[in-house]
Amino acid sequence: MVKQIMIQGTASDAGKSVLVAGLCRLFKNKGKQVVPFKSQNMSLNSFITVTGDEMGRAQVFQAEAAGVFPDVRMNPVLLKPTNDRQSQVIFMGAILDNMDAVTYHDFKQTLIPKIQAVYQSLADENDIIVLEGAGSPAEINLNDRDIVNMGMAKMVDAPVVLVADIDKGGVFASIYGTIMLLNEEERARIKGVIINKFRGDVALLQPGIDMIEELTNVPVIGVIPYANLQLEEEDSVSLSGKNYAPDSNALLDIAIICLPRISNFTDFHSLEIQPEISLRYIRNLADFGKPDLVIIPGSKNTLEDMAFLEESGLKKAIQNFAENAGKVIGICGGYQMLGQKMLDPNQVESRQLEIAGLGLLDTETIFLEQKRTTQITGVTHSGEAVEGYEIHMGETKRGESTSPFCKIKAVNGNEETHQDGAISANKNIIGTYIHGIFDNDVFLGNLFDELLTRKNQSIYPHEIINLKEHKEQEYDKLAALLEANIQMDQLEKIMKGEKICVSTQKPAIKE
């Protein structure tokens, strides 16, 4: 019979996704067949599986940590906000519809038996399932129809461990408030608490631990020290802490336009881990500076984000940068924005029917109701072999003054040839639909060499850090950190359904 444990949090960005990934790697290293599961994920960061199904990036990185291929069953429901009031609802990798919050709140009850069936299929194939909740289980205005926190735990009778982020402050209030806002049945499901991102001497924390255990009758089974691990971040909350000022000691200054509806910002994780590269997110004109490369990322609402560029003055700044021989790369929605105009006659993404683009590429995009979701391999215009994935609802046509960026050779593992993207005559402006393009070592190394040569400097002096190898190392570090700082015997008892009591044992931080 499958063992299961559910990680819920006191708030968004408490560390749920990372904790799930770490536990997956920890159990994998112990020889267990383990998978992650999140019934419903709201995110603009998504991935395409080998079967062409769309799922949340968090469950992809958790699957990597577990040593298994990403499977859409690990994230059956994906919500991708299109604006402040509406989301695209995706079930088992395929679009169902666009819904507002009220409509979806009523509709999601119909998904419960389907979610249960999906979960059972994973349970039949694995030793352990590590479930992840969303936000906080104490969203008392939504709990009557919850399918992702206590509602999911009840569906499969999963024990819950609550994780709280002490780095933000108010950790004991958040633990107590979360538990006490739950009803009696829900409170009974919380079997343990983990305090995350702790800095300092745990002895100073112990009086608070003793008091919160007495108040809630729930044991604190771990205190995880703050660790500077280089892991993918899925929650858009994490973008608020990203740099906006360049590092003067870096060899290259790369600026990413932080669009209001930015999607797939995990595309830039490969850039973040490279030595002597300054990566910063530009939110307004004052932060633009003098970058060596500007990247326009993907967007879930390209037309409205194009309007943001116009209103913020960033459109003119990017155009001026390009006119002065600056290098600009657009990914997916960013590629569409580089063109002359974008048309949305069926209002697929926005109420706007048409908007002018940046005019840096001789291209035109029309939005279609059919989404393209594929994994691809190909060869760029300069001969680099690349792989990645596509997620878009637009069709872009090139004019005579542009050439293709990449020749696609295989789609979802099957031989298929077509052309992707566009590149300007002077080679300075590149647009592509390929997410994950920067994860290709040769392409990235050549890009750095080109940017440095343009500054009359020698080529990039470091070996490109391979993202896959780097992530494997980080997953192992994370697993070791958790094993050293969680009372694993207590966690095992929780997973077996055994009762554990508040302990007088004091946790000791281990780096």
UniProtKB/Swiss-Prot annotation:
Q: Which residues form the GATase cobBQ-type domain?
A: 251-443
> Which GO molecular function terms does the record list?
ABC-type vitamin B12 transporter activity; catalytic activity
Give any Pfam family that matches: GATase_3
- The domain of life is Bacteria
Residues at the active site: C332, H435
Tell me the pathway: Cofactor biosynthesis; adenosylcobalamin biosynthesis
Gene Ontology terms: biological process: cobalamin biosynthetic process
Annotated InterPro entries: Class_I_gatase-like (IPR029062), CobQ/CobB/MinD/ParA_Nub-bd_dom (IPR002586), CobQ_GATase1 (IPR033949), CobQ_N (IPR047045), CobQ_synth (IPR004459), GATase_3 (IPR011698), P-loop_NTPase (IPR027417)
Task: Print the keywords alphabetically.
Answer: Cobalamin biosynthesis, Glutamine amidotransferase
Which PANTHER family does the UniProt record give?
Answer: COBYRIC ACID SYNTHASE, DETHIOBIOTIN SYNTHETASE
Q: Which family does it belong to?
A: Belongs to the CobB/CobQ family. CobQ subfamily.
**What role does it play?**
Catalyzes amidations at positions B, D, E, and G on adenosylcobyrinic A,C-diamide. NH(2) groups are provided by glutamine, and one molecule of ATP is hydrogenolyzed for each amidation.
Tell me the protein's name.
Cobyric acid synthase
Source organism of this protein record: Listeria monocytogenes serotype 4a (strain HCC23)
Q: Which gene does this sequence derive from?
A: cobQ
